[in-house]
A protein has these predicted regions:
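Conserved beta-sheet core of the metallophosphoesterase superfamily
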Residues: 51, 90-109
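Extended, loop-rich substrate-binding clefts of extracytoplasmic carbohydrate-active enzymes
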Residues: 54
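Short glycine-rich, flexible loops that bind phosphorylated cofactors or substrates
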Residues: 37, 88-89
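Histidine-centered catalytic micro-motifs
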Residues: 10, 81-87, 104-109
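N-terminal active-site segment of His-dependent metallophosphoesterases
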Residues: 1-50, 58-76, 81
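A short secondary-structure junction signal
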Residues: 18, 84, 92-94
C-alpha cells in the first residue's frame, strides 16, 4: 500500500519542517498553488515522486507541466484532482461535470 502525502497551497514554501513531516511518504500529491513556479515543483519532485495540478496562483511554466485537473489511478482507485472544486453538496460547475463524467473514487481539491 502506498503512503500518500497530500499537500496544497505551498505558495513557494517547502522547507525543512515539511520535509521532515513528509519523509515517510512514498509519493506526494499537490493540489495546486505551488507558488515559486516550476522550480518549486522540481524541488518537491526531487524530494519524492510528485503528482500535481496547477492552481489559480501558478504561472504558465508550471501549468505546462502540471495541468489544471488530473485523473489517474492509484492502487485500483480512480482519483480526480483539481485545485478549486468546492465541497460535497456545493461543487464547482466544472468539478461537478468531471465528477459525473469520470466517477472518481477519490476527489482531491
Amino acid at each position: 500500500m502506498k503512503y500518500i502525502g497530500l499537500i496544497s497551497d505551498t505558495h513557494g514554501v517547502f522547507d525543512e519542517p515539511f520535509r521532515e513531516f513528509l519523509a515517510p511518504v512514498d509519493e506526494l500529491w499537490h493540489a495546486g498553488d505551488f507558488g515559486g513556479g516550476l522550480e518549486l515543483a522540481k524541488e518537491i519532485a526531487a524530494f519524492k515522486p510528485l503528482l500535481g495540478v496547477a492552481g489559480n496562483c501558478d504561472n504558465y511554466d508550471l501549468r505546462y507541466e502540471h495541468p489544471l485537473t488530473r485523473f489517474f489511478e492509484c492502487e485500483g482507485m480512480k482519483v480526480l484532482m483539481t485545485h478549486v472544486g468546492g465541497y460535497p453538496g456545493k461543487y464547482d460547475c466544472r468539478a461537478r461535470q468531471l465528477i459525473d463524467e469520470l466517477k472518481p473514487d477519490i476527489f482531491v481539491c
